[in-house]
C-alpha cells in the first residue's frame, strides 16, 4: 500500500512512509511491509530488517 523509502534524516537509516527523498546518490526503495523495520544495505542493496 504505502511504499517505504530509506530516509537518512531519521536515525541515519530508517524506513518511513513519508515522501521525503533519500539524500543519497542513488534512490532505492525499501521493501518494507511492516512499520517496525530498518533499512540495511547488503551487497549494494537496501533491505529492511525488523528490530
From Swiss-Prot:
One of its GO terms (cellular component) is nucleus. It comes from the Eukaryota. InterPro entries: Protamine_P1 (IPR000221). It is found in: Nucleus; Chromosome. Protamines substitute for histones in the chromatin of sperm during the haploid phase of spermatogenesis. They compact sperm DNA into a highly condensed, stable and inactive complex. Belongs to the protamine P1 family. This is Sperm protamine P1. It comes from Macaca mulatta (Rhesus macaque).
